[in-house]
Amino acid sequence: MNEPRTLLDVFAGWRTAVPGPCLIDAREGREVRIPAPEAARRVAGLARGLAALGVGKGDRVAIISGDRPEWHIVDFAVLHLGAADVPVYPTLLPDQVRAILADSGARAVVAENPDQLAKVLEVRGSCPAVETVILVDGEAPEGVRTLAALTEEVSADDAAAYLEACRPRVQADDLATLIYTSGTTGEPKGVMLTHDNFVFDAVSAASVMPWPEHQTALAFLPLSHVLERLVSYIYFAKGLALAYCGILETGDALKRIRPHLFTAVPRFYEKVYDRIFHELSTAPRLKRSIFRRAVHVALASVKSGRRGMSWRLYDVLVYSKIRAAVGGRLRFSISGGAPLPVFVGEFFHGIGVLVLEGYGLTETSPVITVNRFDRPRLGTVGETIPGVEVRIAADGEVLTRGRHVMRGYWNKPQATADVLDSAGWFATGDIGELSADGYLRITDRKKDILVTAGGKNVAPQAIEEKLRTSPLVENAVLFGDRKPYIVALVVANLETLRPWAEKRGLPTSDVRGLLENPDVVAAYQEIVTDVNRNLARFETIKKFRLLGEAFSIATGELTPTLKVKRRVVEKRYQEVLASMYTEEATFESWA
């Protein structure tokens, strides 16, 4: 594609693409298509409506909404005015919304529905910059405008002329967005990303993979997150139709929309993997036997790089049916936001769905590296994309430099200076290794490294990942910083634990009683012991506690991209953790 200069150029290419693409509202069983000319008309009409309210170059407009066509309509309307948008996760609490609106100085706020509107109205009094509140769905109370009423009626020709007139007024170095990091630690900071940040990263990432053109992609990761945001701009640049649904509706939408491409976090692939193996575990013996053999052949094909007659046979019997569950038309998919377990990547690759793992951060727009379609190396996050530099610091931290690196943190010059040096090198906070042929492997977060009382450094993420490979484990978090030994909180996967227990005649109605059952305790001890066998003595888990309540975004233990907020978990379960250092090695559940 001809390299665009700004995101307005990206949208211009999409709205004039042939054959004409569309936006698809695939939420809650819908399949409502908005052709590109109609989408452009709505963008122009909304931009004119916002301009009439005084929104202009340099202003900020907040969006608090789930994934839907209106998200991008608001996004592109704001960008055409030379303003920047401020995405807000719909899962945030009112105090968190207040902090973002106040810090960003947003002049207008777009709220998806009455629930999100209630948060905005609750905090509006302490956000003096907010002049206008706009509601997408529902009846607007006094003092609130609806998106439909604000969007001016314009013809297709007038819309095209208006959008074209906007393009020269927006420059590549203009601010495009303030994205507040969800943060597994510390206070969220507003990351300043320009049009050039996004355009460079989109063009560079698109250049190294065979992106399908004029086909359909599905967005279900939050568009408030930089990964789905950046990938969506690649979809627009490639002239794709873009469907939207909520993350809890993904299974249904995949079957209905049958996308050629989507992006997900590793937990999505892990859940699909776990569900497949759980369903097969209860299947008739013959079916289980066929599946086990099919998995063996699939994994062998990954290691050998060849697909012979056996693979083709099992493709008919097994693999094609699994692919059908995700639409049946995927050529590849993308994983980012956290490490993808190698065994999960190998399984999907083996059955014909190549999951390409990449790496980046909000501060890097986000893509730094990605595995290539023709030379993936599972267990790594791939090679740098063109124009991006990476090096490893003396302490193992990954540093990067290039046009993908943010302008800085909004109103936080010292925080910016702490991570971005005078030569343009950005300190990612991740510990990694770079192979001789340029493949990057991330081993842990620098801030997550546990230093025991004996001075030994323990990288917890790899150990936690090994614990999560058990179908009985939903999640696991290690602790032990400045302590004599390592301990773990293990979240039981009740979906798989209950059938496991019933098969052994154990009562399952009471969760606490189930987790305290000696047979259950022994099963989890076996999982921990098995992981410990491959660890150095100082890394081994000496004690653990079982938790019966899964971590969630709503309760604050997970970020919107399902990463564990280690400090939140530590604070919430501080008494449980303390007990593992003050008692003899005994077991206790925390259901």
Regions inferred by a protein language model and the residue ranges of each:
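Conserved AMP-binding/adenylate-forming core of the ANL superfamily
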Residues: E3, C22-F76, L93-R98, T146-S155, ...
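Conserved pre-ATP/AMP-binding loop-to-beta segment of ANL
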Residues: P19-P21, L135, A156-Y180, E187, ...
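ANL superfamily adenylate-forming
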Residues: E28, D115-A172, I276-K321
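Conserved AMP-binding A3 loop
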Residues: R33-P37, A176-A202
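Structural core segment of the AMP-binding/adenylate-forming
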Residues: L53, H80-E153, A523, T529
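Conserved ATP-binding/catalytic segment of the ANL
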Residues: L53, I64, T181, T384-T452, ...
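AMP-binding/adenylate-forming catalytic core of the ANL superfamily
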Residues: L92, V109-A111, I392, G402, ...
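Conserved AMP-binding/adenylation subdomain of ANL enzymes
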Residues: V199-T216, L223-Y319, R329, L354
